[in-house]
C-alpha cells in the first residue's frame, strides 16, 4: 500500500510495504538493461510497493555518474508509475548528494534514499546538517538510511527526531540490527515518519514494534513471499507471517555469508535472472560448502512454491 503526501506512520504512511533494493545486472562491464527490465517486471507483478535502484545492493559505489543517472531514468520510464522508485542518491559529500538528488528529482522519482556519509565520520550535528541540506534541495520525500556497519557512523534517534521536523524527511531505513534503538526511534518519531527494516531477518520483529515494512535484498528473488509476509502481519494473520519468516530465516542469514550483494547476485544468476558479473573490488561468490548450502536452501524454497 502506498500513500500520498501529508501522511504519517499512524495512518496512511508515505512509505510502507516491501521496497526491493534491486541489483544492477552487468554484461561485458555495461548495465544489462534487458535483464534489468525483466527484473522490474517481476517486482511489479509481485506487488511490491517500490524498488530502490542505485543502492548498496545495486552496487552504486562502482557505477559511474552517468550510469547512475541513466539507471534511475530508465527505472522511472520502465515502471510507468506502477510502483514507486526510491532512488539511492547518497554520498559522503553533501554537495554531491545534493547534485544526485536534484538530478533524480528531475527524472521523476517518487522518493530518494540518502545514506549516512561514510569514511569522513561526521558528528551528530554534521549528520543533521547533511540530511537537512539534502532535504531542502529535494522536491520528493526523503528516506534516511542508517547503516553504521558500512558507514562507521550511527544516526541516533535523537538526531532523527530533529530531522523529522524537516519538511521532506518522511521515512527511515534502519539497518543497525539493534531492535532497542529501533524501538526508541519509533517511540520518538513514529507519528511523523515511517520506519522500515534494512535487514530482511528483522522485518517481522520490526513490524511487531511499529515498523511498516522493509527495504529488502531477498525480494530480488522472492518478492511475492516478502510481500505476503508484510501483508499477512498487517492483516493480523500473524501465524502466516511467522511461517514465512521461519521458512526464510536460514536464507536471511546465508544471503550475507559474504558482503552484500555478492550472494544475492550469485543467486539471481543461478535462477537465470542475470549474468554472473559483479564489479571490483567485489568478487564472485566463493564456491564452497556454505555457498552450496545457500543454493540448496533456495531451491528448497522454490520447491515449496515461494516466488
UniProtKB/Swiss-Prot annotation:
The biological pathway it contributes to is:
Amino-acid biosynthesis; L-lysine biosynthesis via DAP pathway; (S)-tetrahydrodipicolinate from L-aspartate: step 3/4
Record GO terms (molecular function): 4-hydroxy-tetrahydrodipicolinate synthase activity
Q: What is the lineage of its organism?
A: Bacteria, Pseudomonadati, Spirochaetota, Spirochaetia, Leptospirales
What species was this sequence derived from? Leptospira interrogans serogroup Icterohaemorrhagiae serovar Lai (strain 56601)
The annotated subunit structure for this chain is: Homotetramer; dimer of dimers.
- Please give the catalytic activity noted in the UniProt record: L-aspartate 4-semialdehyde + pyruvate = (2S,4S)-4-hydroxy-2,3,4,5-tetrahydrodipicolinate + H2O + H(+)
The cross-references to HAMAP family, in alphabetical order and at most eight, read: DapA
Major location (coarse): cytoplasm
This entry's Enzyme Commission designation comes to: 4.3.3.7
Spell out the subcellular localization from the entry. Answer: Cytoplasm
Q: Which InterPro entries match?
A: Aldolase_TIM, DapA, DapA-like, Schiff_base-form_aldolases_AS, Schiff_base-form_aldolases_CS
Kindly identify the residues recorded as the active site. Answer: 145 (proton donor/acceptor), 173 (schiff-base intermediate with substrate)
The Gene Ontology CC terms held by the record are:
cytosol
Residues at the site labelled Part of a proton relay during catalysis? 56, 119
UniProt keyword Methyltransferase present: no
Q: Which gene encodes it?
A: dapA
Q: What is this protein called?
A: 4-hydroxy-tetrahydrodipicolinate synthase
